[in-house]
Every structure is written in structure tokens, then in C-alpha cells.
Amino acid sequence: RLFILGEIIHNPEVNEQIGALGIRNLLGREKQAEVNELTAEDVVIVPAFGTDVTTLAEIKARGCQIVDTTCGDVMSVWKRVRQNATEDVTSIIHGKASHEETRATASRAVLEGRGHYLVVLTLADTDYVCDYIRKGGDRAEFLAHFAGAMSDDFDPDLHLRRVGVANQTTMMRGETEEVQR
């Protein structure tokens, strides 16, 4: 049996063609099966966006053959956020918090219990973070503003002291460059 982790690309026609080939989806809106249903005889395709470390570990534990098509640019971003974690640098990830790639990147920013991340989508989000770094602010308001877009134990008063920028590779390059400034 063949499975895929979410969409191979954000194109409904292509994803319908994949489904017509009998490849079943394990994640996302079009989910057709559960990871706990997998056996060692199954093949699982990891799309170019990659997947989070927990899902990957669950699939490996089931003994499946994995076809990893994660984009090299995505893996470069993962390397950066892992390095940030080892240096106690918080990764500011420019992207959509719910996007598969951003979730995969965020999961690598907190590996081995080290590291933190915060996802910013807009330049207004970035300005909000920069203002908090420069002037401080209401911690509860900050946490509410970025709910669902930060590591579990994120504390802006502690985790914004040293930051590094990473990005969801599908974001506009110019926007990410603005976030970095």
C-alpha cells in the first residue's frame, strides 16, 4: 500500500490524480487513513514540505519504507533552526503557523528539549515582536496575539533575547528579507 503525508503540492488537480492512483493520504483535510494503521509492508511518501519529527518517528517505528522527497531548501532551514536551538537562539519563523512546512520546521526548532520558536506571518507581526524586544510590553497580550504560533513554553521576556530568522520556503523572498531587517 502507498500513502502520502498530506498534499504533495497545493494543487487540487494534482492531489486528485495522486488519489486516483490509489495513494492514500495520512494527514490534512483529505485524510484517508491513520498512522497507527500502517504496517512494515507499507510505503509512505514524505512530500517536499517535509513532516514534523513526531510523525516521522511514528512512521519509522512502524517499520514502513519511507520515500522522503523533502526539498533541499527546506532541509537547509531545518539545519539552521537546529543550530539555533543548540546556541539558545530562538527561531523566528516567517510563515503560516498551520502550514505543513512551518510545523515541520518548528518541530526541529525544539529538538531534545532545547530551543524555542515564534511564527510571524506579516510585517505587522514582525513590528509587534520588534517593539516588544525594544520596549517590553504586556506579556499576556503578546502570548494571546501569537497563540498557536510559538513553542509550548514560550516566554517573550526570556526567549526574545537572542533570535535568528528562518522561513517557510514558499513565502515571498522579499517579505522574508523584510522580516530579517
Segments from the language model and where they lie:
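The feature marks the mature, well-folded catalytic cores of soluble enzymes
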Residues: 1-181
